[in-house]
């Protein structure tokens, strides 16, 4: 049945998948394009090694990227834990700005909002340069924190922004959450598990979910199986109740943008397709969907605030249109 669903989804998404790479990445430097073409075909064989290589490619590009006019307020606490921290990226003197929150990945057990001086501040800086309030946050990690702790942290962060964002020029009625990998899973869990929300709802205006996991059925050869189990546990009978996708039908509609990369971590591309299909079925209208051609699981995030801003422009349009 799952193969049939994926086949039908593939037919639906074929026009997107056939979009020429030049249409998505016309501003990518040729030398970077060439290096990614070398790295990407081996992505799943050495994920951590390829992450390090990709980071080394992008860090100097991001160091040279424009940041003029963006001020950063660092290490603000949105909750009681040491990992309940966020940085605000903004232009001074602006009010009523849409708020764009980025939550990093890290296979549930690692990750930080500051991998180095450039990543992942590049995401919040990009949106600050577009006259928005950029938020770069982190959350609790396994094994110290287990499901649904990180999704609860998403709720804490939203609650903090509701109370404090206006003092920093943000509009608390226009909060958009962007999550990558594990960060996308935590946002989806918060969005679709209504018991994790305030009584009046999620309190957000839209979500961008980048290569997350939404249906929990990990395979024995999944390279992140041990990390997955550290957060979600080893009891397979609990996975259906934990899976965000199983709550889509009952959830309130929310503007959603699903993103995957051409060279993604095993199963995360099909996870995006499954969520896309579930939302199409529920809403009788499909959400925005993009596959980032020639990008891998990390370059899809590292590219923010570089000359290759195709995804950034799509997110800006998503925010403007509300879909």
Each model region followed by its residue ranges:
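Short beta-strand/loop motif that positions the catalytic acidic residue
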Residues: 251, 258-261
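Mobile cap/lid helix-loop segments that gate and shape the active-site cleft of serine hydrolases
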Residues: 62-65, 212-247
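C-terminal catalytic histidine-bearing segment of alpha/beta-hydrolase fold enzymes
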Residues: 259, 270-276, 280-323
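Short beta-strand element of the alpha/beta-hydrolase
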Residues: 96-107
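N-terminal cap/lid segment of alpha/beta-hydrolase-fold proteins
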Residues: 33-94
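Primarily recognizes the serine-hydrolase "nucleophile elbow" in alpha/beta-hydrolase
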Residues: 156-222
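Short amphipathic alpha-helix adjacent to the substrate-entry channel of hydrolases
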Residues: 114-135
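Acidic catalytic loop of the alpha/beta-hydrolase fold
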Residues: 216, 263-267
């Amino acid at each position: 049945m799952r193969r049939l669903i994926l086949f039908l989804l593939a037919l639906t998404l074929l026009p997107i998948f056939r979009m020429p790479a030049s249409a998505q990445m016309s501003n990518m430097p040729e030398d970077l394009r060439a290096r990614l073409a070398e790295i990407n075909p081996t992505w799943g064989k050495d994920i951590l090694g390829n992450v390090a290589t990709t980071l080394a490619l992008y860090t100097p590009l991001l160091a040279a990227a424009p940041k003029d006019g963006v001020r950063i307020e660092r290490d603000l606490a949105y909750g009681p834990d040491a990992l309940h921290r966020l940085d605000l990226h903004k232009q001074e003197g602006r009010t009523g700005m849409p708020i764009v929150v980025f939550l990093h990945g890290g296979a549930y057990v690692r990750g930080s909002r500051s991998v180095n001086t450039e990543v992942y501040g590049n995401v919040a800086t990009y949106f600050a340069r577009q006259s928005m309030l950029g938020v770069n946050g982190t959350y609790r990690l396994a094994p110290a924190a287990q499901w649904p702790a990180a999704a609860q942290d998403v709720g804490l962060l939203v609650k903090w922004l509701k109370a404090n964002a206006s003092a920093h020029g943000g509009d608390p009625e226009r909060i958009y959450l962007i999550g990558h990998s594990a960060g996308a899973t935590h946002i989806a869990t918060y969005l679709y598990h209504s018991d994790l929300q305030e009584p009046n709802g999620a309190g957000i205006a839209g979500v961008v979910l980048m290569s997350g996991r939404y249906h929990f059925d990990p395979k024995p050869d999944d390279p992140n199986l041990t990390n997955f189990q550290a957060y979600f546990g080893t009891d397979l009978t609990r996975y259906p109740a934990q899976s965000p996708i199983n709550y889509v039908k009952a959830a309130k509609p929310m503007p959603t943008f699903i993103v995957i990369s051409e060279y993604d971590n095993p199963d995360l591309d099909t996870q995006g397709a499954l969520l896309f299909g579930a939302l199409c079925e529920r809403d009788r209208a499909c959400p925005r969907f993009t596959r980032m051609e020639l990008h891998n699981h990390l370059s899809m995030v590292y590219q923010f605030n570089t000359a290759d801003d195709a995804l950034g422009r799509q997110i800006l349009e998503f925010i403007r249109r509300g879909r």
